[in-house]
Amino acid sequence: MRFALMIEAQQGLSYEDQLAIVRRAEAAGFESFFRSDHYASFPGSADQATTDAWAVIAGLARETSRITLGALVSPVTFRHPGNFVKLVTTVDEMSGGRIEVGVGAGWNDADHEQHGLTFPDIKERADLMEDQLALLHGLWEEKPGWKFDGHHVKVRGGKLVPGPVQADGRPVGKNGRRRPRIITGSEGSPRGFRLAARYSDEFNLSSSSPETAKRKEAELDAACVAAGRDPKSLTRSTMAGTLLGRDRDEVVRRADAMLAGFGERGKSGSEWLEARRNRWIMGTPDEARAMVRRFAEAGIERIMLQDFLPHDLEHIDLMAEELVGKV
């Protein structure tokens, strides 16, 4: 199993906080790091600070050397599709070719309402997502002069200079040149599967149990076959809440600290975790590894370990020590 560290940066994390986290993750042996892309904090914590995902990632790119970086996922409603391709390509150059790009339709209306952004209905957001994915491929892979007529975007004489960094191990486009890995994420809608089958290198299923992941994998396989694609060529991943402790007492202490960070003081951390046992990676190292094996049996190839204790850097060390290279 491959692992990435994932943080919810909109929960009050400054740039310096995120830099400390990614440096710790890189030193601990994580291969990749993702952060959320939200402009508003979650309900119950509306006054916490937020930062722009790609501005932060650009800074992190200059402060790290090995770990790959990305946002999981960037809503297509935040940035014009053409601007987003240029933005990602620029940050890719700054990183030396260590960027992965996650794309989603967006879901949090508060992100938009608080910042004057339009939040269209789900069909229009899915249309924008299709345009965004088409532009990523088109501007990275098509010859100069490319023409595109999408749902909301038109391109004439399309070209992108410079193109992505030609780093080893990256996907190769139809022009024979390498490009960043493209990840689409959703809870598994039929259209989301179709877009993943057509455009994605990886499909990320959010907050799912292994049983749901197994069922969704069959639907994703069918979408790949319908698109004329080998299902095995599409990597399957999941984002899973993660909380580890070396023993049960440490698990409960961390759960209580996590709830306090959510502004939910007075609740029982152990009871809160128990309600999520079928979809979180949690508990002692043995319990966590057992859950990882269940995801692997369901076809998951990479797990984004969603860490809700961003100031507990020892938790990052523990996740890396007990999971990375151990399952």
Q: Can you name each region flagged by the protein language model?
A:
Residues 1-327:
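Active-site-adjacent structural elements that line small-molecule/cofactor binding pockets in enzymes
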